[in-house]
Amino acid sequence: MTAMTALETVRLLGADQQHILTRAQLIEHGVPSGTIAHRLRPGGPWQRVLPRVICLQSGRLSPHQRLRAALSYAAPKGERPRPGSVLLTGLAVLAEAGLPSAGHPSDVEVVDVLIPAGRRVASRDFVRVHRAPARSTGMPAGFERDDGLWSVGVARALADWAPFAAGSRQFRALCAEAVQGRHCERADLLARLLGGPVATAALPHVQHVADELTCGIYSVAEGEAREVLRRAGLPEPLWNPVLLLDGRFLAVPDAFWPQACVALEIDSRAWHLRPADYERTLTRGNRLQAARLPVVRATPHQLRSDAGPVVRELRTLLATGPHGPYHRITWTRARG
C-alpha cells in the first residue's frame, strides 16, 4: 500500500471517528512514521492532541472530539480503543446528558475517564484518569452512546465527579436534576455516593446530598427550605410524599405535615426543568386547596431573604391542625 493510498484509507476511517485516531491506528493502516511526522509539523494539516492521539484536522477540537481523544489516550498503549475498555465519566457525562447545572458540553474543561485498576495511565492535559476499584465488580459495564462513545451512567458520573466539585451548591443541584429528570434512580445514586471510596462518602457535600436524597428532597430549593424550617424549630415534614384521598391519588406536595394536614409548595420556574413542570406545581396546589387542605406558598427568594411570614403562617397552621378531611388522607413515600 502506498502512502497516498494509506492516507485515503485513514481519511475514511477518520470520518467515522470524528478525525481522531491513535498513532497505532495510523501505523496499522500503512501510514509511514515519516508521513505522520511531516503532517504533524508546525502549520501542517494534522495536530497532536495528546500523547499517541492525533487529530486529522487543524484548529480547535469540538466537544465530541475532546471526548473521543480522551478515550483514545486512556486506551492500552499501542492498541486500538476497545469498546468498553475505557469509559467516560464525570462532568462531561452530566453535560452531555443535559443536566442544566453541568453547563454546555463545550464549557467542560476537564474530561474524566474511568479505566480498570492496575492500568498505568496518568492524567494529562485536559484528561483526568479515574481507576476502578481492584475487585471483580470494580469496572462497570458501561454503555455505548448514540455517538459510539462508551460511558458510565449518570449516577456513577456524579460519584466520580464528587471529589472535584468546586461548590456544594452545584453538586446538590446536579444530584437533584439527575433524580428529578429521571436520569437515574434515587436509590442507585445513593448507593454510588455512599458505596464508593470512603474518602468520597465522607465529603461534607456528599453527606449533605445523601441526607437530602434519603428524606426525599429533589431540588436545591427544597433543600434550602428544609434548612429554613430547621432553623425556625418547626417539625420535620415529609418531602415529596404521594398523598391519597380516600385511597385515590391527590397530589405530591413539596413538603407535608401529616399530623396537621398542612402542605408547603415552593413556587419557582428556576427549579423546574421544563415549563410543564412549573404548571404541574400550580395545578398540584390547586388540587390540595380544592380538597380543603391548607397550602402555604413560598418562593426560594422569599425563603432566603424574608422567611419570617412563611414560618409564622406554618407555625400557626401546625398549631391549629389537623385541617380539612385529615381522616381521609393517607400517604406513601416518594418514588425511589
PLM-predicted stretches and their roles:
Residues T2-M4, V31-P32, V179-G336:
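Surface segments flanking catalytic/ligand-binding clefts of nucleic-acid enzymes
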Residues M1-A202, L238, A319-G336:
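Short gly/ser-rich loop at a beta-strand->alpha-helix junction or flexible surface loop bordering the NTP-binding
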